A protein has these predicted regions:
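Ubiquitin system architectures
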Residues: 1-114
């Protein structure tokens, strides 16, 4: 899946944005989230999270930002892999970040109770 962010901005523009994030927020990770299969939409797709955040904490932040129904399950995919909630995002960032400095995440919502 091609990221909307990559389609909208050139590699150089994205690199500049990630560098600005690193300069402004030391020890943080720039993430771009593509939302698919969502009943609600959000304007916020760029996130800056602390190095120690887990995937579970990122899911909680997304859920709070979008005020999702508790019956909705969220799944995060990085490079077409479902990532366990206990995984520290900085570990994934080191192996899966893009050339532009962002970690691209696909977030999918599924209604689990009907």
């Amino acid at each position: 899946m091609t990221s909307q962010f990559k389609e909208k901005y050139t590699l150089e523009e994205r690199q500049k944005q990630s560098l600005n994030i690193f300069n402004k927020y030391k020890d943080s990770i720039p993430i771009y989230i593509d939302f698919t299969n969502f009943s609600k939409t959000t304007e916020k797709s760029k996130f800056v999270i602390p190095n120690g955040f887990t995937i579970g904490q990122l899911l909680t932040a997304i859920r709070m930002k979008m005020s999702l129904n508790p019956a909705s399950a969220l799944f995060l995919f990085i490079n077409n892999r479902l990532i366990p909630v206990t995984t520290v995002v900085s570990n994934i960032y080191e192996s899966d970040k893009d050339y532009d400095g962002f970690l691209y995440v696909c977030c999918s919502e599924e209604n689990t109770f009907g």
